[in-house]
Amino acid sequence: MSDLRLVIAGCGGRMGRALIEAVTSTPGVVLAGALERAESPLVGQDAGLPLGLTTGVRVSHDVDAALARADALIDFTRPEATLAYLAACRRHKVNMIIGTTGFDDAGKAAIRDAGQEIGIVFAPNFSVGVNLTFKLLDLAARVLNEGYDIEIIEAHHRHKVDAPSGTALRMGEVVADALGRDLKTCAVYGREGVTGERDPGTIGFATVRAGDVVGDHTVLFATPGERVEITHKASSRLTFANGAVRAARWLGKRHGQFDMQDVLGLR
């Protein structure tokens, strides 16, 4: 079986560098392309330069040329860039791994639509530990059920542009679904001033942006007399990058939209 040919979008960013490291150290996959904006100083340089590696792949801004020799594209950029890459992947019938967060409903619909033609793994978090945490949260919510106040606290580095994180929102969805609630109507995002007593049917979110925090998430279930806290802390972006490469290998030639629960056999 030939190696899986992967293209990395946003290769000069924090996740892009981690993805290149993951691809170049994983048997059975090869780096087939590395994409950046046309104005990036990395264009024309070896994609491994920021890592002190020699990959033999030059950074390019030519999406069509990169996809012409690819099996899948891995994208952890921003919604507007992801949707442009999505359109290109549809044209070239190239599968896509999407770790970008912050999509509106229209963006999510575009991804679902593309899943009718190509294979897509779209997930808010590619960490194995986080996806196990989703299962633990489902169990906790069903067992604790009513009478517990639920709060989700997340922390990320100062450069993250969306809040709450996609992972925090997914955690909220998992808990809300387990309780038979709609997160859109029960979520409370931040509190300020005189808010009155807590509505027992709500799920609260608190966001921290500071320093170089890779990603911390805690879901708190609290009732008079006890608290249950389920926490995941990431210390390296390689955790997410390795998960994304694993997802690409699992996806193979499949068509349709999947997430990491499918990849890990947790669904």
Curated annotation (Swiss-Prot):
Tell me the SUPFAM superfamilies matching this sequence: Glyceraldehyde-3-phosphate dehydrogenase-like, C-terminal domain, NAD(P)-binding Rossmann-fold domains
Where do the catalytic residues lie?
H156 (proton donor/acceptor), K160 (proton donor)
> Record keywords: Cell membrane included?
no
What EC number(s) has UniProt assigned to this enzyme? 1.17.1.8
- Which residues does the annotation say bind (S)-2,3,4,5-tetrahydrodipicolinate? H157, G166, T167
GO BP terms = diaminopimelate biosynthetic process; lysine biosynthetic process via diaminopimelate
Copy the pathway line from the protein's UniProt record.
Amino-acid biosynthesis; L-lysine biosynthesis via DAP pathway; (S)-tetrahydrodipicolinate from L-aspartate: step 4/4
Q: Which GO terms describe its cellular component?
A: cytosol
Q: What EC class does the entry list?
A: oxidoreductase
Q: Catalyzes what?
A: (S)-2,3,4,5-tetrahydrodipicolinate + NAD(+) + H2O = (2S,4S)-4-hydroxy-2,3,4,5-tetrahydrodipicolinate + NADH + H(+); (S)-2,3,4,5-tetrahydrodipicolinate + NADP(+) + H2O = (2S,4S)-4-hydroxy-2,3,4,5-tetrahydrodipicolinate + NADPH + H(+)
Q: Which amino acids does the record list as binding NADP(+)?
A: R37
Main location class: cytoplasm
Sites where the protein binds NAD(+): G10, C11, G12, G13, R14, M15, E36, G99, T100, T101, A123, P124, N125, F126
| Pfam families in UniProt | DapB_C, DapB_N
Q: Which InterPro entries match?
A: DapB_C, DapB_N, DapB_N_CS, DHDPR_bac, NAD(P)-bd_dom_sf
Q: Which UniProt keywords apply?
A: Amino-acid biosynthesis, Cytoplasm, Diaminopimelate biosynthesis, Lysine biosynthesis, NAD, NADP, Oxidoreductase
Going by the entry's taxonomy, the superkingdom of the source organism is recorded as Bacteria
Its annotated compartments are: Cytoplasm
Give GO terms: molecular function aspect only.
4-hydroxy-tetrahydrodipicolinate reductase; NAD binding; NADP binding; oxidoreductase activity, acting on CH or CH2 groups, NAD or NADP as acceptor
Q: Where is the signal peptide?
A: none
Q: Which family does it belong to?
A: Belongs to the DapB family.
Q: Provide the function of this protein.
A: Catalyzes the conversion of 4-hydroxy-tetrahydrodipicolinate (HTPA) to tetrahydrodipicolinate.
Q: Which NCBIfam families match?
A: dapB
Protein name, entry field: 4-hydroxy-tetrahydrodipicolinate reductase
Q: What organism, scientifically named, is this protein from? A: Laribacter hongkongensis (strain HLHK9)
Report the gene name. Answer: dapB
